[in-house]
Amino acid sequence: MNPEYDYLFKLLLIGDSGVGKSCLLLRFADDTYTESYISTIGVDFKIRTIELDGKTIKLQIWDTAGQERGRTITSSYYRGAHGIIVVYDVTDQESYANVKQWLQEIDRYASENVNKLLVGNKSDLTTKKVVDNTTAKEFADSLGIPFLETSAKNATNVEQAFMTMAAEIKKRMGPGAASGGERPNLKIDSTPVKQAGGGCC
C-alpha cells in the first residue's frame, strides 16, 4: 500500500507565553494572522504537508500554548518529537533569557538527537526590538543550531523556519528512513554542550 507521504515529522513549538507560537503555527498551516488570538488551553496541533527534495513530508506541528506559564509541559509532549522550535519575542528580553531554560527542558525530556531551531519572533516590531540579532545568532551558533528571526504578522521567514527544520530532520534521518519512529543508529552531529549558569545575553 502506498502511503500519501514519505515522512511524518512531529514538530513542537515551545517558548514563553505571548511570544507568538500560535501565530507562527497559524501563519504556516493556514496562512492566517489575527491580533486577537486567545491563548490556547492545553495542546493544539495542526498538520501541513510539504514537498522537499522530491519527497512528500507530513508535518504534525504541536503548539504548547497554555502550559508554559508554569513550565509544566509534560515529558510525554516531547516524546517522539523529531524537531523542536524554541521561540522568543525580539521585543521581550525575558523571553530570550528564558530560552536557556527551554533548552534544558529539551535536554531533559526529548530524544537525544532531536533537531532544534531558535526563532526570534515579532521582527516586524523594529522600534521595540531589544534582543539583538547578532547576540542571538552567536548564541545559536555556540549550540550548533540554526537561528532565524520571523514575523508571523507579515509572514517573514515563517515558511523558511519550518522548511529549515524539515530539511534538517530529513538530512539527519538519511535516505530510506521510515516515516517517524526513533532510529537509534542515527549519528548525532550537533549535540549541544550544556552551558554553565548565567544568562544567555
Curated annotation (Swiss-Prot):
Activity control mechanisms: Regulated by guanine nucleotide exchange factors (GEFs) which promote the exchange of bound GDP for free GTP. Regulated by GTPase activating proteins (GAPs) including TBC1D20 which increases the GTP hydrolysis activity. Inhibited by GDP dissociation inhibitors (GDIs).
Further information: Rab-1B binds GTP and GDP and possesses intrinsic GTPase activity.
Enzyme class: hydrolase
Free-text comment about domains: Switch 1, switch 2 and the interswitch regions are characteristic of Rab GTPases and mediate the interactions with Rab downstream effectors. The switch regions undergo conformational changes upon nucleotide binding which drives interaction with specific sets of effector proteins, with most effectors only binding to GTP-bound Rab.
Lineage: Eukaryota, Metazoa, Chordata, Craniata, Vertebrata
Residues anchoring lipid (S-geranylgeranyl cysteine): C200, C201
Binding site for Mg(2+): S22, T40, D63
EC number assigned by the record: 3.6.5.2
Post-translational modification: Prenylated; by GGTase II, only after interaction of the substrate with Rab escort protein 1 (REP1).
Function: The small GTPases Rab are key regulators of intracellular membrane trafficking, from the formation of transport vesicles to their fusion with membranes. Rabs cycle between an inactive GDP-bound form and an active GTP-bound form that is able to recruit to membranes different set of downstream effectors directly responsible for vesicle formation, movement, tethering and fusion. Plays a role in the initial events of the autophagic vacuole development which take place at specialized regions of the endoplasmic reticulum.
Keyword Iron-sulfur among UniProt keywords: no
Cofactor: Mg(2+)
Switch 1 (motif): residue ranges: 30-45
Alphabetical list of InterPro entries matching this protein: P-loop_NTPase (IPR027417), Rab (IPR050227), Small_GTP-bd (IPR005225), Small_GTPase (IPR001806)
Key words, A-Z: Acetylation, Autophagy, Cytoplasm, GTP-binding, Hydrolase, Lipoprotein, Magnesium, Membrane, Metal-binding, Methylation, Nucleotide-binding, Phosphoprotein, Prenylation, Protein transport, Transport
GO MF term set: G protein activity; GTP binding; GTPase activity
Xref: CDD domains: Rab1_Ypt1
Name under which the protein is recorded: Ras-related protein Rab-1B
Bilayer disposition of the protein: Lipid-anchor
Sites where the protein binds GTP: 17-23, 33-36, 39-40, 66, 121-122, 124, 151-153
Any one annotated GO CC term: phagophore assembly site membrane
Protein family membership: Belongs to the small GTPase superfamily. Rab family.
